[in-house]
């Protein structure tokens, strides 16, 4: 229980939320390196996964606003969970495009954003897709990029679950 109490206290610090934000910044910079230095063309699914990652960053910013306020902290947890779950579902779908190809299951040709937020027009260097979802263009330790994203988003959900359990556990005084 001491570990859960420590995790609850840590989640009430701004440092914990800024650390989550730092991970998002790191992974986004990795994506930019892959795209602009290694010249790996991002596909539609890559862009959607990138947005899910940025959603985790927004969750971190929400939590960092007032981490000692339970309402703000739980809003941060909810946004973290929603973005991580959506990212995991997108990454799993992307892995299926790569390793279980089907003429009936293909990704879109173009990213689609709401008319009120055409991100690919506002920031094309970050949100424009021109790659093929089914191609494996990069691997590290035998895993493709979407497979790594499955690991990353699943790890986020696991970390979130641990922090939620810590919030609900009774703390000894």
From Swiss-Prot:
Domain of life: Bacteria
Cytoplasmic side: 1-16, 68-74, 167-173
Transmembrane segments: 17-33, 52-67, 75-92, 148-166
Keywords: Cell inner membrane, Cell membrane, Chaperone, Disulfide bond, Electron transport, Membrane, Oxidoreductase, Redox-active center, Transmembrane, Transmembrane helix, Transport
Keyword match Cell membrane: yes
Compartments (UniProt record): Cell inner membrane
Example GO biological process: protein folding
InterPro entries noted in UniProt: DiS_bond_form_DsbB/BdbC (IPR003752), Disulphide_bond_form_DsbB (IPR022920), DsbB (IPR050183), DsbB-like_sf (IPR023380)
Cellular component annotations (GO), alphabetically ordered: plasma membrane
Main location: membrane
Keyword check for Nuclease: no
One protein family per Pfam: DsbB
Periplasmic side, ranges: 34-51, 93-147
GO molecular function: electron transfer activity; protein-disulfide reductase activity
Similarity comment: family membership: Belongs to the DsbB family.
PANTHER family for the chain: DISULFIDE BOND FORMATION PROTEIN B
Protein role: Required for disulfide bond formation in some periplasmic proteins. Acts by oxidizing the DsbA protein.
Protein name: Disulfide bond formation protein B
Species in which this protein is naturally found: Vibrio cholerae serotype O1 (strain ATCC 39315 / El Tor Inaba N16961)
């Amino acid at each position: 229980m001491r570990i859960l109490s420590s995790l609850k206290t840590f989640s009430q610090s701004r440092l914990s939320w800024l650390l989550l934000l730092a991970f998002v910044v790191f992974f986004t910079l990795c994506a930019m390196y892959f795209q602009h230095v290694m010249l790996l063309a991002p596909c539609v699914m890559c862009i959607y996964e990138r947005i899910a990652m940025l959603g985790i960053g927004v969750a971190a910013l929400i939590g960092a606003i007032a981490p000692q306020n339970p309402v703000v902290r739980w809003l941060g947890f909810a946004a973290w969970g929603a973005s991580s779950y959506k990212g995991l579902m997108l990454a799993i779908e992307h892995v299926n495009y790569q390793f279980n190809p089907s003429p009936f299951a293909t990704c879109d040709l173009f990213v689609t954003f709401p008319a009120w937020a055409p991100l690919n027009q506002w920031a094309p260097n970050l949100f424009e897709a021109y790659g093929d979802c089914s191609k494996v263009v990069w691997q590290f330790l035998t895993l493709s990029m979407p497979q790594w994203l499955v690991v990353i988003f699943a790890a986020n959900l696991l970390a979130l679950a641990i922090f939620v359990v810590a919030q609900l556990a009774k703390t000894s005084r």
